[in-house]
Amino acid sequence: MRILADENIPVVDAFFADQGSIRRLPGRAIDRAALAEVDVLLVRSVTEVSRAALAGSPVRFVGTCTIGTDHLDLDYFAEAGIAWSSAPGCNARGVVDYVLGCLLAMAEVRGADLAERTYGVVGAGQVGGRLVEVLRGLGWKVLVCDPPRQAREPDGEFVSLERLLAEADVISLHTPLNRDGEHPTRHLLDEPRLAALRPGTWLVNASRGAVVDNQALRRLLEGGADLEVALDVWEGEPQADPELAAHCLIATPHIAGYSLEGKLRGTAQIYQAYCAWRGIAERVSLQDVLPETWLAGLQLNPGCDPAWALATLCRAVYDPRSDDAAFRRSLTGDSATRRAAFDALRKHYPPRREITGLRVATGGRVELQRVVRALGAQLV
């Protein structure tokens, strides 16, 4: 097999070395010419795999190490008989850790009690569903909007988007980017909906940039709208809007799901799909390539405040403010410089583990055990 992989996909050799020749390119450089002699294509979300790129090529399998598939022309894949796989849920836990870090930063700035907020989660798939589990596990009030899932689960606890936007203090977006169809999500939060948000609302977008109308959001924030905003995704990536970023409490370069586990899990999942497509046995597993966690065990004082414990456990693993600082330093120079910096921050992102690898002792206090279990950390 002739394999072409995005150079930023990790451990490709570990999984695919015995499957043929492997060539690597920057994801944004993968085009029609690059696919002239390729059987297997491995990409991330930065590569648009379209009819124009694939027509006439020998590509027979496409794997994307991402949850989303809006960069894949699935209609053409079906027409051309091209097998494909995404990596559903691969980085979901990393995104949840990111959102928790954003909420802690917002609460610190606002002097708010996270337990007293009402949370609205838009999109309850792999990421949003896990976030809902964590928030409800903490005992917090959560509203969920997911029309496609509601259609499949008519007895589920879902609300309309209008009700969620009207009642939630915190809105976290986790939808795919659908430009058409029954449930389009491009500019789901458009100017009228953004303008109607309650004063003091917190907004987190770690899904796709175009789910929020970035220009409308910037105009509102420049006009003094009382919102706290955390954006990890941007319209026109890798060209993020510096003026919009300046008005965000947290601004990062599409790294919410960049945990080490998430990255390696994504490669493992497309390898599994590739093996199934070829009808061959898997010879490598995720556990073969995943380093043992370096997170230290933590001992919580049984008398500590559960809210303090929550913040301490989350920040012991990840605090998005460090990524925010690095991103803001990159938002200088001309457009080409900023685009290159956006990709460089993602390419050279430091290893980050997930909260699920944290081992925590609580001295037997039930309230602290609830926090640990809700976060998905390990009780010892």
From Swiss-Prot:
State the UniProt keywords alphabetically: Cytoplasm, NAD, Oxidoreductase, Pyridoxine biosynthesis
Pfam families the UniProt entry points to: 2-Hacid_dh, 2-Hacid_dh_C, DUF3410
What enzyme class is recorded for this protein? oxidoreductase
**GO CC annotation, single:** cytosol
What EC designation does it have?
1.1.1.290
| Localisation per UniProt entry | Cytoplasm
Q: In which pathway does it act?
A: Cofactor biosynthesis; pyridoxine 5'-phosphate biosynthesis; pyridoxine 5'-phosphate from D-erythrose 4-phosphate: step 2/5
Q: Which SUPFAM superfamilies match?
A: Formate/glycerate dehydrogenase catalytic domain-like (SSF52283), NAD(P)-binding Rossmann-fold domains (SSF51735)
Keyword DNA damage belongs to the record: no
Q: Which reaction does it catalyse?
A: 4-phospho-D-erythronate + NAD(+) = (R)-3-hydroxy-2-oxo-4-phosphooxybutanoate + NADH + H(+)
Q: What are the positions of the active site?
A: 208, 237, 254
Q: Quick one: which residues bind substrate?
A: 45, 66, 258
| Source organism, top-level taxon | Bacteria
| Keyword Aminoacyl-tRNA synthetase applies | no
Q: What does the UniProt function comment say about this protein?
A: Catalyzes the oxidation of erythronate-4-phosphate to 3-hydroxy-2-oxo-4-phosphonooxybutanoate.
Family to which this protein belongs: Belongs to the D-isomer specific 2-hydroxyacid dehydrogenase family. PdxB subfamily.
Assembly and binders: Homodimer.
The protein, known as: Erythronate-4-phosphate dehydrogenase
